[in-house]
Amino acid sequence: MEAKLKQLEEKAKQDIQASTSTDSLEKVRVKYLGKKGELTEVLRGMGSLSKEERPLVGKIANLVREQIEEALELAKGAVKDKELESKLKMESLDVTMPGKTREIGKRHPLIQAMDELKSIFIGMGFKVAEGPEVETVHYNFDALNAAPNHPSRDMSDTFYINDHIILRTQTSPVQVRTMELQKPPIRIISPGRCFRNDTPDATHTPMFHQLEGLVVDKGITLGDLKGTLEVFIKQFFGNDTKVKFRPHHFPFTEPSAEVDVTCFKCAGHGCSMCKGEGWIELLGAGMVHPNVLRNCGIDPEIYSGFAFGMGIDRLTMAKYEIDDIRLLFENDMRFINQF
């Protein structure tokens, strides 16, 4: 039995030395040490030995097992080293070759414009206020003095989730929520995303960005509104920019105006960008309607205020002479890297 075990050990070591891969070494392990392996079969024959022989043979068998296991571990390490060396040779790297560079991102022109707008108004004493994009009909229309039959309430203009919940069409609801929670004086801007049921084209998208401003205090006049907007426009577009106020109508302001500026491309002389008029419509503004103040719990006999709103997307287009609003949302780095 002892001679048989020694012979089995030598045979196993020969098979281990002949193995050239981890798979072949695993087969050797199963062949000799597995449940049906040769060493296991020899040990099963120990029942025929005498009581005196069994301890001696058992000790020798354990030594043989240890020798085979040790030889297997050493061989596995050597085989893995050879496999790694072979793999590295096949995947050799030329360190003199230039590396692959990743494309570097850049701040989007919309974000650049929005940050600049915030900076200007914060410098004028405004605070930034935010509100939900999923809004109630009350805050988006009712509290802003919009008539029940106002066209902006139609499903052709507004995304309705149900009869009372919509995607906000403007950031004006933020002004209402602020006036409900805060007593005058109030001086805020509310930038954010808005949604309208528009068909995408060169000047319209279903999602767009808007910035609105609100000032409420005692003694606020139309002159304060005019002065605030003129300072903003000249800081954003340059001191040579001229400003023109035209009478208009909005349900939430009275009186109301639309504000035009001289064309950035032709400096007011007339071109394709301004359709030959020399002026570009920039934003809407006016004095806060007394009904809006009342709806928010503010006495219009004591306080007055002004509000204004502008599309950040169109403002960005005007400043950077972009002729198609859809370019802002295509994530084309060739376009974004121009700004």
Swiss-Prot record:
Signal peptide range in chain numbering: none
Record-linked PROSITE patterns: AA_TRNA_LIGASE_II (PS50862)
Chief subcellular location: cytoplasm
GO molecular function terms noted in the UniProt entry: ATP binding; catalytic activity, acting on a protein; magnesium ion binding; phenylalanine-tRNA ligase activity; transferase activity; tRNA binding
Keyword Magnesium: yes
A biological process term (GO) from this entry: phenylalanyl-tRNA aminoacylation
Keywords assigned: Aminoacyl-tRNA synthetase, ATP-binding, Cytoplasm, Ligase, Magnesium, Metal-binding, Nucleotide-binding, Protein biosynthesis
UniProt-listed CDD domains: PheRS_alpha_core
Enzyme Commission number, as recorded: 6.1.1.20
One Pfam family in the UniProt entry: tRNA-synt_2d
Biased composition annotated in UniProt, kind: Basic and acidic residues: 1-14
Co-factor: note: Binds 2 magnesium ions per tetramer.
Cofactor(s) demanded: Mg(2+)
Subunit structure: Tetramer of two alpha and two beta subunits.
UniProt record similarity statement: Belongs to the class-II aminoacyl-tRNA synthetase family. Phe-tRNA synthetase alpha subunit type 1 subfamily.
Protein name (database record): Phenylalanine--tRNA ligase alpha subunit
Organism: Alkaliphilus metalliredigens (strain QYMF)
